[in-house]
A protein has these predicted regions:
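FIC/Doc superfamily catalytic core
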Residues: 1-154, 158-207
């Protein structure tokens, strides 16, 4: 594949991926509108926030892609916070900062832990993940546990899916795009992990 073909492949992927990941979180831009926004156009009657969510998610994906192409290293807290910082680039007071208030997860019965426990829980999660060689199963479980913790005030879903793709691509696989049309299956898989610690259903979405 030529460099131009590779760039076109990722351009097409990031448009659909950005649309789906943002739509899962409530962004109302259509796929075509997302494509136009990523080309620098403004969509009439759509809020600035939704435009920024699109461009910032794209930028976060290309940051992740750069990490994959760079010197291999284990997942760490600094990388997670940097990905989140790009996703929430328009909110300097919140980006890359663990939340300091209670939150609820859209579409989930699980109640995230008290914010005071987040630094410890994230440290333990990262230590657990890096304690063995990564696999798709381990990536899926990391994602489920990350979403349970819900460490940030906003952007947890988008950030969590970007982290999953970082780790998937580090294994040599193509990035995964969980479709907006499959959001119920995605939420159900997360809820199933909350209730049973069974990750197979979620793992199938990362293939």
């Amino acid at each position: 594949m030529t460099q131009g073909e590779l760039e076109r492949k990722y351009e097409d992927f990031v448009t659909e991926y950005t649309y789906n990941s943002n739509a899962i979180e409530g962004n109302t831009l259509t796929l075509r509108e997302t494509a136009l926004v990523l080309r620098g156009l403004t969509i009439d009657k759509k809020p600035l926030k939704e435009h920024l969510e699109a461009t910032q998610h794209r930028d976060a994906f290309y940051y992740v892609l750069g990490l994959v192409k760079g010197t291999p290293r284990k997942l760490d807290e600094a990388t997670i916070k940097q990905i989140h910082s790009i996703v929430l680039n328009d909110r300097p007071e919140d980006r890359g900062v663990y939340r300091k208030m209670p939150v609820r997860i859209m579409g989930a019965s699980h109640i995230p832990p008290n914010w005071a426990k987040i630094p410890t829980l994230m440290h333990e999660l990262i230590e657990w993940y890096n304690s063995e060689k990564p696999t798709r199963t381990r990536i899926a479980e990391f994602h489920a546990r990350f979403e349970q913790i819900h460490p940030f005030i906003d952007g947890n879903g988008r950030t969590g899916r970007l982290i999953a793709n970082l780790e998937i691509m580090k294994l040599g696989f193509e990035p995964v795009d969980i479709k907006f049309a499959n959001r119920k299956e995605y939420y159900d898989a997360l809820n199933e992990y909350d209730e049973t610690k069974e990750v197979k259903r979620l793992e199938t979405l990362f293939i």
